[in-house]
UniProtKB/Swiss-Prot annotation:
It is a multi-pass membrane protein. Keywords: Lipid transport, Lipid-binding, Membrane, Mitochondrion, Mitochondrion outer membrane, Transmembrane, Transmembrane beta strand, Transport. GO terms for biological process: mitochondrial genome maintenance; mitochondrion-endoplasmic reticulum membrane tethering; phospholipid transport. GO terms for molecular function: lipid binding. This is Mitochondrial distribution and morphology protein 34. Residues 382-391 have a biased composition (Low complexity). Residues 353-367 have a biased composition (Basic residues). Component of the ER-mitochondria encounter structure (ERMES) or MDM complex, composed of mmm1, mdm10, mdm12 and mdm34. The lineage of its organism: Eukaryota, Fungi, Dikarya, Ascomycota, Pezizomycotina. It is found in: Mitochondrion outer membrane. Its main location: mitochondrion. Component of the ERMES/MDM complex, which serves as a molecular tether to connect the endoplasmic reticulum (ER) and mitochondria. Components of this complex are involved in the control of mitochondrial shape and protein biogenesis, and function in nonvesicular lipid trafficking between the ER and mitochondria. Mdm34 is required for the interaction of the ER-resident membrane protein mmm1 and the outer mitochondrial membrane-resident beta-barrel protein mdm10.
């Protein structure tokens, strides 16, 4: 059995297309849309094409003059097309936040603002194949039910065809929507269209409902809320008005009723303005606005001068190491001249002038801190003008001193500023070498007691007495704090010292302080030992007592870079 479809009347009927577009629009907007679609989907164009579908009868269940029931196999490969228009959300962050709970998602401001873009989609090249249960009745219309998913493929053309991933996403999303449409909404659309064609009662009832909607839309706009005066009107100055004054103003054509504002609304506007200047918890929410409390000008001025007590003070710090090494003949001390170069290697502490200041607002002071505990409570005097240190008591804490005869006359005005380059000078010997020096002094002292009668200058003897008070050859040299002293006349013994950045070390040997001859002899031996070490270093042919020391310290050391402010 075969059927002939008269497809041309459907193509020629303009009313049929209009009604079909309205039904498709309602069906597309009925189901929940994806969050990327932010507007209604509107069918702007519908064309069934010139090629009808193919039907193959599989089973006929009921056949009469006014009714028919059967199972068909339908296939369609025609030229029908459908055009849709809508608006989509182009900001993915906005789409993400819409689909997440507000308490579990961040709340950005302008970054989550919506950006809608109009979208036009054209669906064409439909490929349909499936089993259809068709029931026809003149009183009940046509009922079509698909037993399986009839949609095989279709072509989706949109505004974003140039963007590959957007095109693929739209293709996938629209195919899913159309599969649900064919299974759920299309049978209802076909049933309503059949009732409109064959059932006159349904056609009359539908026309009456359409006329009622048209009359309601043509009745005009609703009542203007601004045309009636407010409940508590006020004038431009904020004074309340009684009803009689409002009536007189309303009768006057020179004054408009819209100029009268409610007193409550003015209070709300004032509260809205004041809420921006306070820390109120009931600040009304405004889109894309961050609320921040205002501070007075006095607070702003004071905040510029305040400094956090935990904020560190950034200042240039340098590690200092001695560069000129010599054994002083009259003081028996090992001295070092300042040279801002390599790391300290364990013979002292770092000098941080900006770290020990009492206040950030005061002028920075440069001091040297003594980290050793004094053995007894003694008097330590120092002169801050020319870095002159002195000592009166033989049992006082050790101080840094040296003889000016073995150092250059260059003044170091700014000990914090590093030198331009490294200096190839002598360095401090290791602890092992200092022990050997002390042992050599003791050996020479036992064998040459006759040389203790040599005369020494008074200043050298005084310096030697101070240096020999603490016999600790293995002690690590440390800096001592310089206390300001204005009384120079009270200093009996003075010795010119290095700048504050230099570090000196004084190796000593155990001495019997009660024997002055022994002290004189020790000072003589120390000077002789220092002279021999200098000669051995200068003369390459001679035998050197400390070959490892001279080899290790003859290499040039590269200074570290200076710290920036």
């Amino acid at each position: 059995m075969a059927f002939n479809f008269n497809w041309s009347p459907l193509m020629a009927d303009a009313g049929f297309y209009t009604r079909a577009q309205d039904l498709l629009t309602a069906a597309l907007n009925k189901s929940p849309k994806p969050p990327i679609i932010v507007d209604d989907i509107k069918v702007t164009e519908l064309n069934l094409g010139s090629i009808p579908p193919d039907l193959e009868i599989l089973e006929v269940g009921d056949l009469a003059e006014d009714r028919f029931r059967g199972i068909f196999k339908m296939s369609y490969n025609g030229d029908a097309f459908l055009t849709l228009k809508t608006r989509v959300q182009a900001n993915p962050l906005n789409t993400f936040l819409v689909t997440r709970p507000s308490f579990a998602s961040p709340k950005p401001l302008a970054a989550a603002s919506g950006l809608t873009i109009p979208l036009q989609i054209t669906l064409s090249e439909f490929r349909l194949s499936g089993f259809v249960v068709l029931v026809f009745s003149k009183q009940k219309g046509i009922t079509v039910v698909f037993r399986n998913d009839p949609l095989e493929s279709l072509k989706v053309s949109s505004t974003f065809d140039s963007i590959s991933f957007v095109r693929d996403y739209l293709q996938k999303a629209i195919e899913g929507q159309l599969r649900a449409l064919f299974m759920d909404e299309l049978p209802a659309i076909i049933h309503r269209l059949s009732l409109r064609l064959w059932v006159p009662e349904y056609r009359d009832r539908e026309s009456e409902s359409v006329n009622t909607l048209d009359l309601s839309s043509e009745s005009g706009p609703g009542q203007d809320p601004l045309a009636s005066p407010p409940q508590d009107p006020v004038d431009a100055s904020g004074n309340a008005l009684n009803p009689s004054e409002v009536a007189s103003l309303s009768l006057d054509s020179g004054v408009e009723i819209h100029n009268l504002f409610s007193h409550k609304n003015l209070l709300r506007l004032a509260a809205l303005t004041d809420s921006q200047r306070t820390l109120s918890l009931f600040t009304p929410s405004i889109k894309d606005v961050v609320y921040r409390a205002w501070t007075a000008s006095a607070e702003l001025g004071e905040s510029n001068t305040l400094t956090s007590p935990t904020s560190p003070v950034l200042s240039r710090t340098h590690s200092h190491i001695g560069s000129l090494h010599s054994f002083v003949d009259n003081a028996s001390t090992i001295s070092m001249q300042s040279g801002g170069s390599s790391n300290f290697s364990g013979f002292g502490s770092y000098l941080r002038p900006g770290r020990h200041s009492r206040s950030h607002t005061k002028k920075r002071k440069k001091r040297v801190v003594d980290l050793r505990r004094p053995k007894t409570t003694d008097d330590v005097d120092s002169v801050s003008g020319d870095s002159v240190f002195s000592s009166e008591n033989a049992t006082s804490a050790p101080t840094i001193f040296s003889s000016p005869a073995h150092f250059s006359e260059e003044k170091n005005d700014d000990p914090v500023t590093p030198p331009l380059g490294p200096q190839n000078d002598l360095h401090l010997p290791t602890i092992h070498e200092r022990r050997r020096i002390s042992q050599g002094d003791q050996t020479l002292r036992r064998s040459n007691l006759s040389m203790s009668e040599a005369a020494q200058p008074s200043s050298s003897r005084s310096a030697q007495m101070i240096a020999e008070t603490w016999p600790d050859p293995d002690a690590t040299p440390r800096n001592t704090i310089r206390l300001p002293s204005n009384d120079r006349a009270s200093n009996r013994f003075t010795a010119v010292s290095l700048p504050s950045s230099a570090i000196q070390y004084t190796p000593t040997v155990p001495i019997n302080n009660n024997n002055p001859r022994e002290q004189v002899w020790l000072s003589k031996m120390a000077a002789e030992l220092a002279r021999r070490m200098q000669e051995q270093k200068i003369d390459p042919s001679g035998s050197r007592p400390f070959p490892d020391f001279w080899d290790d310290h003859s290499r040039e050391e590269i200074p570290p870079p200076a710290y920036g402010h």
